[in-house]
A protein has these predicted regions:
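C-terminal helical cap and adjacent loop that interface with cofactors, partners, or active-site loops
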Residues: 118-195
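Residue-level detector of functional hotspots within protein domains
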Residues: 4, 9, 20-23, 107-112, ...
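Generic signature of intrinsically disordered, low-complexity segments enriched in small/polar residues
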Residues: 8, 73, 79-80, 85, ...
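Long, contiguous hydrophobic alpha-helical segments, chiefly transmembrane helices and signal peptides
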Residues: 14-18, 22-25, 34, 111-112, ...
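Active-site rim elements
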Residues: 10-16, 109-113, 183-190
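Alpha/beta-hydrolase fold catalytic core
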Residues: 91-138
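Sequence-level detector for tyrosine residue identity
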Residues: 76-77, 107, 112, 141, ...
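Predominantly a Rossmann-like dinucleotide-binding segment in NAD(P)-dependent oxidoreductases
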Residues: 1-107
Length: 195
């Protein structure tokens, strides 16, 4: 909500910007084109009127930052999530670069006090050729900062996250787990963006 995808006219609609791989996967998995779709979502929560009392304009200057689940300091500086967003200039360290961005750049702004105009949640329902139905939910409100996939089939189901994929068959109890942990940390969605 605070980074490069915060405004549709400067980037893309958020579903395209953040879920294009998910939609590609669904199209590949079904092998079908979408016949009909409906979509609901809005920018309901990350607005100034919903900011907690005491929230500052920037996370580093915020009196309630340590209790905020959306703290940019915690996300980027402490946990080191999404640090590929920061271009480290020659002669600077990653810590220096992150702190400077948190002090002056778009990534240090309070999520409630940004100039964002994209939805903070969206639900997409699609009917594919062959009467296959698909739903996709893009949520900002989750403790899990990764994709989850659950595919229900007539003979089994597939569920996974960005590290593992588990395939279970209803008859016979056959279950297989595929582990992708060794590539999950690679940049550009483990190289998928480059192909």
């Amino acid at each position: 909500m605070r980074g490069i995808f915060r405004r549709e006219r400067e980037s893309n609609p958020i579903l395209l910007a953040k879920c294009c791989h998910d939609i590609d996967f669904l199209l590949w998995l079904t092998g079908a084109h979408c016949r009909s779709l409906s979509s609901f979502g809005s920018l309901r929560w990350f607005r100034a009127e919903n900011a907690p009392a005491g929230a500052g304009r920037r996370c580093l200057d915020c009196a309630i930052e340590s209790a905020c689940p959306f703290s940019a300091r915690d996300l980027y500086y402490v946990r080191r999530d999404w640090v590929a967003n920061f271009d480290v200039p020659e002669g600077k360290t990653l810590d220096e670069t992150i702190l400077e961005e948190l002090r002056t750049g778009m990534y240090g702004r309070c999520v409630y006090h940004c100039d964002n105009d994209v939805v903070d949640h969206q639900l997409l329902a699609m009917e594919m050729e062959g009467e296959v139905t698909v739903s996709l939910s893009m949520e900002m409100f989750t403790a899990d900062d990764f994709r989850k996939t659950h595919v229900r089939l007539t003979g089994g189901e597939i569920d996974g996250d960005e590290r593992t994929l588990r395939v279970r068959r209803f008859r016979g109890g056959d279950e297989r787990t595929y582990d992708f942990s060794d590539i999950v940390g690679q940049p550009f969605h483990a190289g998928a963006d480059l192909h």
